[in-house]
């Protein structure tokens, strides 16, 4: 009965708030089982494991992660989230099916959730473009909003794309439905970003990528594709989260998102031919009690 699994989910949240973590995990797991492995409950259980790992390091979440992995070995959400917990150091990319499913599940609540996290990335990127516009004429650009989601960046990008158009591409069809209702974009594409870029060489004056590289570990390949998709003199503007956990180039955090080192991003851009114009360290959002820091980066194709 689907109502039973949602009841278990609510009980799980209540136990978590009371810091009764073992009972929270028991109810969260029961919700997964009662739903017969429904993706919504898999996502809820994954975030429950992550939040409890952060809130209560003494709680043995890894044994729950191993059981989850054993019971649902073929589910992309389970594979990714248990991978982040059990062997984060060996993961370089995120399964695109996982990204699609997670954003399809969150599409309706996405902007409300980000609002509660003090999510600053779109406004920070808008400021970077405003600063550039003081010195460079930007009004007639063809722009790609890569990983456009619900269109949070579309509002500030649209004014720079009045004549040549603003395109958006995203894996999640449900996020694109929300973006479409805003009527900000000239065209919207439901495609994998790498595949899309490979078909649009010399197509854009600006590629905007807000919080996209949190779902890419290795960045060299996508930097090459973005370089080729830009017209000469074109720019990329993106955010990236800071890896302050270790000395690795990139690191898959317990949250299931990648963090990157500053030197890896800088060297990767230069190696692919970009000229770095801006690299500002900023607070991107809150995550629980913690602040997530990273960089707003702008780089130009000669």
Indicate where each model-derived feature is located.
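Short alpha-helix
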Residues: 257-272, 279
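N-terminal auxiliary segments of SAM/dcSAM-dependent transferases
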Residues: 44-100
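A conserved beta-strand element that flanks and buttresses the S-adenosyl-L-methionine
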Residues: 208
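A short glycine-rich, Lys/Arg-flanked "PGG" loop and its adjoining helix->strand segment in the class I
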Residues: 220-235
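Short, glycine-/aromatic-enriched active-site segment of Class I SAM-dependent methyltransferases
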Residues: 238-258
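Conserved alpha-helix/loop element of class I SAM-dependent methyltransferases that forms part
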Residues: 118-139
């Amino acid at each position: 009965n689907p109502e039973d699994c949602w009841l278990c989910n609510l009980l799980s949240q209540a136990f978590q708030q009371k810091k009764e973590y073992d009972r929270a995990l028991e109810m969260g797991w029961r919700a997964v089982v009662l739903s017969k492995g429904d993706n919504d409950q898999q996502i809820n259980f994954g975030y429950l494991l992550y939040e409890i790992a952060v809130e209560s390091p003494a709680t043995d979440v890894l044994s729950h992660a191993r059981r989850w992995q054993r019971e649902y070995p073929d589910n992309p959400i389970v594979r990714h989230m248990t991978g982040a917990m059990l062997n984060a150091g060996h993961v370089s990319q995120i399964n695109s099916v996982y990204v699609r499913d997670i954003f399809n599940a969150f599409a309706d609540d996405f902007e409300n959730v980000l609002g509660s996290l003090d999510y600053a990335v779109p406004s920070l990127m808008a400021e970077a473009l405003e600063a550039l516009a003081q010195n460079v004429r930007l009004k007639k650009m063809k722009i790609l909003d890569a990983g456009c989601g619900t269109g949070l960046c579309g509002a500030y990008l649209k004014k720079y794309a009045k004549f040549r158009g603003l395109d958006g591409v995203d894996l999640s069809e449900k996020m694109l439905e929300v973006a479409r209702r805003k009527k900000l974009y000239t065209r919207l594409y439901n495609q994998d970003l790498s595949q899309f870029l490979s078909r649009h060489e010399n197509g854009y004056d600006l590629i905007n990528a807000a919080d996209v590289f949190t779902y890419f570990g290795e960045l060299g390949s996508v930097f090459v594709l973005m370089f080729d998709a830009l017209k000469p003199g074109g720019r990329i503007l993106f955010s990236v989260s800071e890896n302050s956990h270790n000395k690795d180039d990139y690191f898959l955090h317990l949250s299931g998102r990648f963090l990157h080192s500053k030197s890896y991003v800088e060297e990767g851009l230069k190696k692919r031919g970009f000229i770095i114009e801006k690299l500002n360290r900023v607070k991107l959002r809150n995550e629980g009690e913690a602040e997530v820091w990273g960089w707003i980066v702008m780089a130009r194709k000669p």
